[in-house]
Amino acid sequence: MTAACAATIERLAVLGELVPVTTRVNEQYRRVRLPGPAPLYAITTNGAEILVNGKPDRDWSRSVADRLAAGFPLDAVWEQASHVCHPEFTVKLRNADGLFCYAVVRPKHLPMGFAEDVAGWAAERGWRTSLQGRKLYWVPETLTKSAAVREVARRMGADRVLAAGDSLLDVDLLLAADAGIHPRHGELFDQGWSAPTVTCTESSGELAGEQIVGWFEREAGGASA
């Protein structure tokens, strides 16, 4: 993160409620340090957890667990992932708090068509996949970031939601927001994804990060275009 990016993030905390949203589980999220004051709300585990002042909202967690219980079970997905993720290209397979799973892979060693095959298998069972760098995720379609964001926005009485993301697991979030942005790199850019209410940065890498937080600041009314 550049110094300019960090400074803009600190200013954003004055313009509105900055809510981190991540696929990371709580333990992984707590290792992340963002500039500025600690957020009142954070959304982790791809929407399964809403943290309020750093503590999980148990009612929300229970409602998510009840919703997921009606779907195709994680145990069966884990079994399939264990079967198809061969040692030649898989470093390890991980369970994310009993909600979804992911494999740490060597992307350059993945067999031709592997990502498409696992995506097809998952889709037939109400799950979706996302390849983000070295991590290949299997996540239930009913576990979404957008549902958690809508709940947080409702509690806050927010009249406008802005969002940023770079993976297929961010699509529902970007589409649910009033406006969104994604960087000129990552899974969404590589797949040519676009939407009328979502813009793309002009640059990639660290400069994309600066452009994203600058976009947030302008959209929130804190800087001139």
Language model segments and positions:
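Charged, glycine-interspersed solvent-exposed loop segments at helix/strand-loop junctions
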Residues: 92-108, 132-139
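Active-site phosphate-binding/coordination module
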Residues: 2-90
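Short secondary-structure junctions
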Residues: 86-94, 124-129, 199-200
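Mg2+-dependent phosphoryl-transfer enzymes with acidic/Ser/Thr/Gly-rich catalytic loops
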Residues: 138-139, 146-225
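Substrate-recognition "cap/lid" segment bordering the active-site pocket of phosphatases
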Residues: 51-71, 127-159, 220
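Substrate-recognition/cap helix-loop segment adjacent to the acidic, metal-dependent catalytic center
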Residues: 24-43, 109-129
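Short, surface-exposed ligand-recognition loops at beta-strand->loop->(often short) alpha-helix junctions
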Residues: 68-72, 105-112
